[in-house]
Amino acid sequence: MKKLLFASDYQEGAHPKIIQRLAETNLMQSFGYGMDEICESARERIRAACGCREAEVHFLVGGTQTNATVIDALLQSYEGVIAPDSGHVSLHEAGAIEAGGHKVLTIPHEFGKISAKAVEEYCKEYEQDLNHEHMVKPGMVYISQPTEYGTIYSLKELEALSRVCRENNLPLYVDGARLAYALACKQNDVSLKDLARLCDVFYIGGTKCGAMLGEAVVIPKPGRIPHFFTIIKQHGGLMAKGRILGIQFDVLFENKLYETIGQGALAAADKIRACLAASDYMLDFDSPTNQIFVSLNDSEVKLLAECVEFSFWEKLDSGRTVVRLATSWATSDEDVERLTEVLKKMESSLDGSGEQQ
């Protein structure tokens, strides 16, 4: 039997409406590098959704390129970026930020999030250190919505972070690789308009949220990053056939598709969580979006790996392993049903100690 793929949320292609629009416009001639009419239409739709008519909107090819480009553009050579120690730029971008000449200044996370208080304390400690001229200066703050742990910042938390960042002259940058799943979450109270109001730069994820590829960077205040187009090209994030990206975001922001596309993923994740709880598996913590983290013993990991592709997350001091299961906008009811059947069979094949009978 073919393995079930729950390792990530970018294992499918693109939403059918995007494929249809790409096919319809395939032979259309247009200007390059995002200067075409479709990209401009997408920009206008995004500006309207963000309630920010003057915002700059730039289309880049992928998440790591986007983070590396934005962070390098916002920082001076002597500055680093404050980020949670669990952040994507901290762990899973192969040193892309450091390769660009900037240090990632990590703060301990709490379920993927960092607080305004922690950022404020970091800045105070830097200033109070008499040797701070010999140190990397904190120059901006990076967070993601949702976080790497699938948790989300509340509006109150984001407002507090924004306030501390502005008090300390630190640009606030939000990585929205999975933003559609936060927007679709029932517990979420942060809108695109809130992001535009509270952040200096943020990006709207496409790759993990229904697009074939691509991310849309939003800079609410035009001119905040001078010559950003050129900087994008320097970092290899600019597509000559830019309309390929524009078409996808034009579709995603037509009739509010982006704000609803994550609903199916969240419903699927909730079904999986319910099955795990009913079968007495140990959820590592509560994540309200499309990522599920479950703690397994070695026997359970081995059995699950026979039928399901999942992501290793971390090894606990207890010897148990935390694995991640991720749903996406395209996760089918059939695959969810098959996964729950696998989980139930695993439970029945193990004795009370969690070992295989």
Question: How does the language model describe each region?
Answer:
Residues 101-139, 143-146, 153-160:
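PLP-dependent aminotransferase-class I/II
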Residues 104-105, 172-174, 283, 310:
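Hydrophobic beta-strand scaffold residues
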Residues 73-91, 120:
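Conserved PLP-anchoring active-site segment centered on the Schiff-base-forming lysine
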Residues 76-78, 270-271, 275-351, 357:
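Conserved C-terminal alpha-helix-loop-beta "cap" of PLP-dependent enzymes
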Residues 111, 137-138, 144, 152, ...:
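Active-site C-terminal subdomain of aminotransferase-like
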Residues 153-185:
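Catalytic PLP-binding core of fold-type I/II PLP enzymes
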Residues 15-63, 85-86, 90, 96, ...:
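Conserved N-terminal alpha-helix of the aminotransferase class I/II PLP-enzyme fold
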